[in-house]
């Protein structure tokens, strides 16, 4: 069996029958909720909109390196940009305002994260029935086992992207 890029696989001691599909779905759920892949470190090419401001926000919270930047189909010399670990680029030349104006090839992500354990916990719950609580005529509860618990949401919130311009 090939190890998936997120590095998580079922273990023999896992409670219940956790499958690779369960794990992959839990990881995909966390990534969708966060707005980016989170882990592991990987090179990726991303395309973003710009407001015309020289500061451009990339979809990451851990930028390790900027390999290339293209603005309006023109490569930007790397010495014409500054970047922060939180995913911001500052271009010396103001880009034009518009959709899909900036494409950057970046190295980003975390080597490890506590969210890997959250993904495994979510995968272990994948086949459990949804839990509901009813008081009178009102019923509340999680719609399915792949919904993070409140403690897991608090951890996930540390890795979620904010609103993008």
Language-model regions: role of each:
Residues 1-165:
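Divalent metal-cofactor coordination and adjacent catalytic microenvironments
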């Amino acid at each position: 069996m090939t190890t998936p890029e997120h590095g998580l696989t079922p273990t023999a001691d896992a409670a219940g029958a956790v499958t690779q599909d369960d794990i992959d779905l839990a990881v995909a759920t966390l990534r969708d909720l966060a707005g980016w892949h989170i882990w592991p470190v990987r090179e990726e090419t991303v395309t973003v909109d710009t407001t015309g401001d020289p500061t451009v926000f990339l979809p990451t919270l851990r930028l390790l390196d900027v390999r290339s930047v293209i603005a309006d189909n023109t490569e930007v010399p790397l010495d014409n940009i500054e970047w922060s670990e939180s995913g911001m680029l500052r271009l010396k030349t103001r880009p034009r305002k518009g959709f899909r104006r900036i494409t950057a090839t970046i190295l980003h992500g975390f080597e490890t994260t506590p969210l890997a354990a959250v993904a495994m916990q979510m995968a272990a719950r994948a086949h459990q029935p949804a839990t509901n609580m009813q008081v009178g005529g009102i019923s509340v509860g999680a719609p399915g086992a792949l919904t993070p618990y409140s403690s897991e949401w608090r951890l996930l919130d540390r890795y979620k992207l904010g609103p993008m311009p």
